[in-house]
Amino acid sequence: MARKYPLDKFRNFGIMAHIDAGKTTTTERILFYTGVSHKIGEVHDGEATMDWMVQEQERGITITSAATSCFWKEHELNIIDTPGHVDFTVEVERSLRVLDGAVTVLDAKSGVEPQTETVWRQADKYGVPRMIYVNKMDATGADFFRCIQTVKDRLKANAVPIQIPVGSEQGFKGMVDLIKNVAFIFYDDLGKDMREEAIPAEYADQAEEYRAAMIEAIAETDEELMEKYLEGEELTIEELKAALRKATIANEIYPCICGSSYKNKGVQEMIDGVVDYLPSPLDVPAIKGTTLDGEEDHRNSSDSEPLSALAFKIATDPFVGKLAFTRIYSGVMQSGSYVLNSTKGKKERIGRLVKMHSNSRSEVESLEAGEIGAVIGLKNTTTGDTLCAENSPIILEAMEFPEPVIRVAIEPKTKDAQEKMGMALAKLAEEDPTFKTWTDTETGQTIIAGMGELHLEIIVDRLQREFKVECNVGAPQVAYKETIRSAVKAEAKYAKQSGGKGQYGHAVIEMEPTEGEYVFENAVVGGAIPKEYIPAIDAGIQEASKNGIIAGYNVINFKVKLVHGSYHEVDSSEMAFKIAGSMAFKNAMSKASPVLLEPMMKVEVTVPEEYMGDVIGDINSRRGIMEGMEALNGAQVIRAFVPLSEMFGYATTLRSRTQGRGVYSMVFDHYDEVPKNIQEQIAGSRAK
């Protein structure tokens, strides 16, 4: 079957932003203008098409990354809606992995906010080309130029306006298109009556200044254009657009435009920008992976190559069961066919294939290279798995997810719901890799862990709504970690020889702190320990490191070198060496200056000037480390690093200290050492 749209007419892009910058509204407007939505869904009414889980509609925030296909000027657009709330970083990470480009939505009155920085860094990691859409130009305090300055200052990005606003706040009525050198003025509220006009006289000088800066920025990325520009030749619209497209795809320029999605101004121009400047699947590098033998391999974006696809999200649908959102990188996926899940080494049957429009769907026979759709009927596939042709296996790069930073104990209100709760939690953990659940071996309690209080609230909410399990939830606890500060040598001998077959294992290790993950190195020479026992020592060390010696928390950032040991011809066994490894680790850790680490949150508080002293005093009392302050539209923005353990219940405190006028956001940043006196308190309370 011939393709409906050639590959260069595809745009797989996401819309990313800080919470409340207007991301869902912007997506809704795109769906409205591209003809998929017949009624504009308002977040304020809890009606937005993309926000399809009940919790999202109640809270007015986007949690699940829904993929939607729509069409614009002979292009197929696949939009991945990403949440802006910090607790759902995993959803953003997941979507960025399968996007080719992104639109970063900024709030015109706030500019770059903490979550914008987090998401921007994640996009940098995957090299995703971006354009910037400054939204809410009609709001009080809107300032396009200050907004762009925050991008340059805080994101260190080469933000180049390709539009400037005509008016702002209540008087926002259009924009100057600097490439075409004309103005677009709106004469109605639905954005339908937009007229192309000459640039209003009062904006002529400003437009000339910004157009010259834009042309220079574009010319700097292209030698031929630079020559023409320096010789004083006029650059054509086609030349500017082609060079800007190239520079955007190369992440050399981030084009900036403006609008007000809520007032339907500027959205169509933004969709034009997506088509004009963001990459098609052919513009991004071939997807990399490895063969089953570990050799490097890659696949080009083409229907004729063997199938390779990535399942980037698992969702449970009330009508059809498990849906696996999948990006096809190469080849064609047919419904009813068999594929290999190369990550798990299992064969899977593709039941049905659907293209999603938020939470409605249309069934299709096949998904081709560059497309994003959902697969129904997969039994063993989880987030991040590769699906590929059985006769041409490839494993695409896995996705990385952060470890949870907060945990709570949870129990069903009735004993007979225990099994039901266990199954429900397992299902939710399958959908969300940053959500973990386990049973505490000491207390027998079920523990759930995630990226923040809101994250866990929503999990508990879903247990009740979707799985009909009512739960009692304990107080939140911080996921502390332990580590060491000095290098040591230690040994342990495990010997039991009292008649009959004994046990014997002896290991000598060197342990030192590292920046990265755990590393085990075998440096035993001369066969002091037989090779088959080495993995057992490694396993013993890893098992023991799950319970550090200060307060029983997971130990991180250390390296072990096995340097010597001994064995017994008859009595040695894997179990004996595993125990010896575990004992050696504990001996080493006790001598290696062990310390407790706690998650530090990057906190940003915006308060009216008169409350600033009070709020800073409160942050200091929470062991906060001030990072800086800046004035913003008559308010003060305070930035600090504060331990997560000190932030529980902060929303209530801030409300009462600022009479409800202060707002804050926080995002996990790094682990830091806990002060000695507090370390002793934590260790003491854990020992009780």
From Swiss-Prot:
Amino acids binding GTP: 17-24, 81-85, 135-138
UniProt KW keywords: Cytoplasm, Elongation factor, GTP-binding, Nucleotide-binding, Protein biosynthesis
Primary localization: cytoplasm
Domain (tr-type G): residue spans on this chain: 8-282
Location of this chain's protein in the cell: Cytoplasm
A Pfam family assignment: EFG_C
CDD domains in the cross-refs: EF-G, EFG_III, EFG_mtEFG1_IV, EFG_mtEFG_C, EFG_mtEFG_II
Gene Ontology MF annotations: GTP binding; GTPase activity; translation elongation factor activity
InterPro entries, per database record: EF-G-like_DII (IPR053905), EFG_II (IPR041095), EFG_III (IPR009022), EFG_III/V (IPR035647), EFG_IV (IPR047872), EFG_V (IPR035649), EFG_V-like (IPR000640), G_TR_CS (IPR031157)
A GO BP entry: ribosome disassembly
Annotated Gene3D superfamilies: 3.30.230.10, 3.30.70.240, Elongation Factor G (Translational Gtpase), domain 3 (3.30.70.870), P-loop containing nucleotide triphosphate hydrolases (3.40.50.300), Translation factors (2.40.30.10)
GO cellular component, one term: cytoplasm
HAMAP family: EF_G_EF_2_B (MF_00054_B)
Family: Belongs to the TRAFAC class translation factor GTPase superfamily. Classic translation factor GTPase family. EF-G/EF-2 subfamily.
Summary of the function given for this chain in its UniProt record: Catalyzes the GTP-dependent ribosomal translocation step during translation elongation. During this step, the ribosome changes from the pre-translocational (PRE) to the post-translocational (POST) state as the newly formed A-site-bound peptidyl-tRNA and P-site-bound deacylated tRNA move to the P and E sites, respectively. Catalyzes the coordinated movement of the two tRNA molecules, the mRNA and conformational changes in the ribosome.
Name this polypeptide is given: Elongation factor G
Gene that this polypeptide is encoded by: fusA
